Amino acid sequence: MHFKKVGKLATEATAFYGPLREFSDSQVERINFALIHALHDFMPDDVVTAVFEHGGKGHPLILGVANNRVYAFDVPQPPGENEPVVQVRWRSYRLDPEHCEVHAELSYTRPNPAFGQEVNRRTRWRFRIHDLEFDLPTRVHAESDGVEPREELAQSLAKSLGVIPASETDVKSLREVA
């Protein structure tokens, strides 16, 4: 994976370890360095990616989807202040509907032109891919030009598993309904 994209993902992930989490700059830099190299070495170039909290402990999970595979990266145990080694856990799973589940809770906001509201959808995607389970909360706005990375990743996963048609969840379909 290209270093520019890798650097952006690693920086987004290490933001979870910021000052509120009582990690020093040195610890965060070591985590960032390890993630950059793990992503560069083990994440394919043509991947759809997102970073989000996982496991309810404030730890980031970096996920990628490409070629019917899911790639997951995390730091299971952040290093201590004087520990030079950072362990990055890398997992790769084949997207097999027999070993995967997708659930979604959807809520829609009806537009109200008087208040400038637009149609939007909030979704809490829940995935189980072999032994990896995670939630992806997302939001889609009808007036938005793009899709947030977490929504793009969730759609890519659901489409790869064949549980939703390719056109059912995109922003264009929200605009057409409005």
Pin down the residues of each PLM region.
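Phosphoinositide-binding peripheral membrane targeting modules
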Residues: V51-R122, E133, S160
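A sequence-composition feature that detects small, non-aromatic residues
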Residues: A10-A15, A34, A38, A50, ...
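Generic extreme N-terminus detector
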Residues: K4-V6, R89, A178
